Amino acid sequence: MRESVHRRTRLCAVMSLAVVSSSFFALPATAGAEPVSTAAAADTPVYAIESAKASRTLLLDVAHAGARLVVVGDHGHILLSDDQGKTWSQARVPTRQLLTAVFFVDEQHGWAVGHDAQVLASSDGGKSWNKQFEDLKREAPLLDVWFKDLDNGLAIGAYGLLLSTADGGQHWEDVSDRLDNEDQYHLNGIAQVKDAGLFIVGEAGSMFRSRDEGQTWEKIDGPYQGSLFGVIGTAQPSTLLAYGLRGNLFRSSDFGDSWQPIELKGARGPLEFGLASATLLADGSLVLVGNGGSVMRSTDDGETFAVFNRSDRISLAGVTGNPQGNLILVGQGGVRLTSPTGADTTQQ
């Protein structure tokens, strides 16, 4: 039986902070049958509480809005940094729900998604946000979001939820029936793969790919039956990584036709922590993060990884880099600016 999605607000004490696996849900099977409801413009918003400690609370994702960094997390917190992660300020946000993912298509326009199937949008680099969409009856969170341009985007979430917009989020359409997902497996991650298309991964090893920017989807047989928490395209055409429970990591160089398991081995042996998030850095290297303070870097397009475990063993949910080569990590205990390996300066 799937446990309540609301337990995801305590993910710092359990599995992955970045995504929701099959063990985090136990809602009625009819939840996905509720009609889509766009947030009413007349609704009086409840804004996130401003707090000096917001940067130390549970944070789940990080993105670049041009030179600015934007992070999202619990209680509707959205934080901004204009000095590459040294200091943070809090944005004004019309929700107190947990926000799970954020995506910017350029330095001004971005979207954040979260619980209550909420979609928030910003047109000023994350300084202010408006609520574009929510569905209170669905009782399922959105877990990832992707935009092709200012108009066309997709959001994915629990119970196989797939939303599409063609007008920058002014209207969202439930297009879950585009997926061959009869069991309504939770969809955890979506990514664009260079010169190939879009790829979605989720619960029970589910995988879907699209060669036409999300208009149609093909279900494919993957290499793993456990939950996959995310997917990322590499710098090479048709090449991607899918990652999930217990350190399971797989690489494909043909857009999912075939897969190779990638071993992650640290000083104490094979890594068995859940993998939560990944990023492609400007130099083409890949960085993965997960539970147990795990930070992994690849400089050969994901064929091998060097594994580093932070001494604090915190659960990490998101990662990106800055122009100086340092990493910005988010997760348990907030946001951290670290060395290129993921270590704090005192650990180097």
Question: Which residue stretches match the model-derived regions?
Answer:
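Bacterial N-terminal signal peptides
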Residues: 13-26
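Residue-level hotspots at or immediately adjacent to binding/recognition sites across diverse folds
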Residues: 31-348
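Bacterial N-terminal signal peptides that target proteins for export
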Residues: 3-16
